[in-house]
């Protein structure tokens, strides 16, 4: 699917050589790995909040959830919202998956890692 293509594109980028995907791992395999990461990148799910609680810098993609409810409680979370939205306008029905560009995520991730 399209998400796998985006993950592959990111993993093959200049910062991707230090990255890996959790897509095939279960929670027991994932937690020790998360704790040793420098940055979490992903949509607003439990993984974002677990990563933040473990003290990681996080880049949360708020494509279909309200930033004001889930993205502002931790200094560890940087946010990206869909094009044309504001932090206040994102909701559970934003349907913004196709309105967040790879370049925007890549550039913000690079900034957070440097």
Residue ranges: model-predicted function:
Residues 1-63:
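Donor-binding and catalytic core of enzymes assembling or modifying cell-surface/extracellular glycoconjugates
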Residues 3-5, 67-68, 86:
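Flexible, glycine-rich phosphate/dinucleotide-binding loops
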Residues 54-82:
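Gly/Pro- and small hydrophobic-enriched strand-loop and loop-to-helix capping segments
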């Amino acid at each position: 699917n399209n998400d796998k293509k985006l993950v592959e594109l990111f993993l093959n980028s200049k910062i991707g050589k230090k990255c890996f995907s959790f897509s095939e791992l279960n929670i027991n395999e994932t937690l020790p790995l998360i704790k040793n990461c420098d940055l979490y990148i992903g949509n607003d799910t439990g993984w974002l909040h677990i990563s933040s609680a473990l003290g990681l810098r996080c880049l949360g993609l708020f494509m279909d959830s309200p930033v004001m409810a889930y993205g502002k409680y931790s200094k560890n979370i940087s946010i990206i919202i869909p094009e044309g939205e504001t932090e206040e306008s994102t909701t559970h029905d934003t349907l913004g998956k196709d309105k967040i560009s790879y370049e925007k995520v890549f550039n913000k991730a690079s900034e957070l890692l440097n």
